Amino acid sequence: MNSIEFPLLDQKTKNSVISTTLNDLSNWSRLSSLWPLLYGTSCCFIEFASLIGSRFDFDRYGLVPRSSPRQADLILTAGTVTMKMAPSLVRLYEQMPEPKYVIAMGACTITGGMFSTDSYSTVRGVDKLIPVDVYLPGCPPKPEAVIDAITKLRKKISREIDEDPISYQRENRSFTTNHKFDVGRSTHTGNSNQGLFYQPSSISEMTSDTFLKYKKVQYPATNEKVN
């Protein structure tokens, strides 16, 4: 078709055709439809819940909250994470398909917050358990700050390369020292003798002398009645 005879047609064609790469198209589709898994445990999550309302309306960013980690590509942690909750959080993260992203929301999630000063069971930073892409400080952060964190994550996704996106994410994430979990069987004996903590997991593997040694617990005699 002769473009000289149809100048208007040629002008419309240039304005309606977009040339791009498959990598950019893939990044655009992922950043425009993030499906978050909401892992909220404290007051920070209340601030995130306000985004669902009509004032902020996070649906315009393509965010669709999911209840299953297998359908989510973004996990948003908000609130205090304890040592007892840590294995569940790691399990949820491992069940998410690649590529996946993490936003740490609030001081308690990032550093442990005020609960980490005198608590032995508080995880001092969720990045000790799972890699974090965006840190969102605040106590609690405002809904506008959450939108800003999502915008920064979208910009990060748009710059990802197509060669190996999974390794690219892992190389560009911040890690700190991981917690070491020693799984043991607790015994409520009434005193500080916890010798069964690191014994074999099955009682059948113990010798009879070892079992009877910790089985016999001497309680002080008392005549007081407890109401």
From Swiss-Prot:
Membrane topology, from the record: Peripheral membrane protein
Similarity section: Belongs to the complex I 20 kDa subunit family.
UniProt keyword NAD, yes or no: yes
Protein name: NAD(P)H-quinone oxidoreductase subunit K, chloroplastic
Record's cofactor remark: Binds 1 [4Fe-4S] cluster.
Gene source species: Pisum sativum (Garden pea)
Matching InterPro entries: NADH_UbQ_OxRdtase-like_20kDa, NADH_UQ_OxRdtase_20Kd_su
Gene: ndhK
Higher taxonomy: Eukaryota, Viridiplantae, Streptophyta, Embryophyta, Tracheophyta
GO molecular function: 4 iron, 4 sulfur cluster binding; iron ion binding; NADH dehydrogenase (ubiquinone) activity; quinone binding
